[in-house]
């Protein structure tokens, strides 16, 4: 790894090391909020390569060895928490299994492979002269957009000018990403006896609201993210069959585009719904990076596809410019028998190296 450009044999050796780490992580349960053991594995790996590590709860942060005050800062980030395993796996989700050119295991694709590739590219970039400083962050609680993930690391990281977020994008560069608003909606009525048709049925009010949510289209359509998306995903009403319900509660999953703030979207919904509309949070915003940013231009030069992402990542909690890219396929995420193709590890390493080595990063954060 000491030459400017690695031979394929050298890259294969790096890929084997990354694979070994990925297998350790798969074998370690790391549900969101329970990432202590996986954080320890990543911490020890960094220390074995000579890096000082800062643990911020279950987040693992490391700085490059050749830090230059005042230089722009590149953050390499991916998450090491996973969703919970479902019961319909054909193999043990915590046992890394190689078969048919694949590595199976929970978190192998989302986001174990991007994580280990970014970590070993962090090592690789540290051995080469760059015009930027390097940060590496293995974050916790990404799958639940938790407050004990990226948000509690921002102060420790300081100024960041560009983040590369590792998620399974088939090594396409996601230049925009939808945000998320989860709404708890309650419609109110008056209880009464169902046989006598008494009361005001809150469930019927909810049906009217759901019909509006299903048919309404926000006027502003993003060139890159398209329309705002809304889906009702949960509903609950009533206590027994012969009582008209006096309240109905339902949940709405809203995926904003970059034409509206989250608060603007909530206000529009409130204007049209006869009920209480309460967002669980407003901070998971859409994100995007300018088409003329050097990382976007370099991706174009390399023939890397630039896409918009419908799924959300830790980008939503980052106040600085970011892109999302990594080995693996988003359609494999959160599925039984999750896997990564072994060749994707090698492709991820080489793809990251081509994109990031020698990149000129403009300042964004104030110094």
Q: What kind of region is each of these model predictions?
A:
Residues 2, 13, 84, 175, ...:
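Metal-dependent amide/peptide-bond hydrolase catalytic core
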């Amino acid at each position: 790894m000491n030459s400017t450009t690695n031979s394929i044999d050298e890259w294969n050796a790096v890929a084997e090391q990354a694979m070994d780490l990925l297998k350790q992580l798969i074998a370690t349960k790391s549900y969101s909020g329970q990432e202590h053991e996986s954080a320890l594995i990543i911490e020890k790996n960094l220390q074995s390569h000579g890096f000082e590590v800062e643990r911020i709860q279950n987040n693992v942060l490391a700085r490059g060895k050749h830090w230059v005050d005042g230089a722009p800062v590149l953050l390499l980030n991916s998450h090491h928490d996973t969703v919970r395993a479902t019961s319909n796996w054909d193999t043990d989700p915590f046992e890394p299994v190689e078969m048919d050119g694949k590595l199976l295991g929970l978190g192998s694709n989302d986001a174990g492979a991007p994580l280990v590739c970014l970590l070993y590219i962090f090592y690789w970039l540290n051995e080469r002269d760059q015009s930027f400083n390097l940060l590496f962050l293995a974050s916790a609680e990404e799958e639940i957009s938790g407050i004990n993930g990226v948000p509690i690391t921002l102060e420790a990281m300081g100024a960041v000018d560009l983040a590369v977020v590792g998620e399974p994008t088939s090594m396409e560069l996601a230049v925009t990403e939808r945000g998320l608003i989860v709404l708890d909606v309650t419609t109110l009525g008056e209880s009464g006896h169902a046989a006598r048709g008494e009361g005001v049925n809150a469930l019927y009010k909810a049906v009217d609201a759901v019909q509006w949510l299903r048919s309404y289209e926000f006027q502003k359509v993003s060139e890159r993210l398209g329309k705002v998306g809304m889906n009702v995903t949960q509903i609950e009403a009533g206590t027994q069959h012969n009582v008209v319900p006096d309240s109905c509660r339902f949940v709405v999953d809203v995926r904003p585009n970059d034409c509206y703030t989250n608060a603007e979207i909530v206000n529009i919904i409130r204007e049209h719904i006869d009920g209480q509309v309460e967002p669980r949070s407003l901070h998971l915003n859409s994100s995007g990076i300018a088409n003329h940013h050097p990382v976007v231009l370099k991706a174009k030069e390399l023939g890397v596809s630039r896409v918009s992402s419908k799924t959300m990542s830790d980008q939503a909690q980052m106040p600085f410019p970011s892109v999302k890219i990594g080995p693996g396929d988003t359609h494999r995420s959160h599925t039984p028998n999750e896997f990564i193709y072994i060749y994707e590890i090698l492709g991820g390493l080489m793809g990251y190296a081509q994109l990031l080595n020698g990149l000129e990063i403009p300042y964004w954060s104030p110094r």
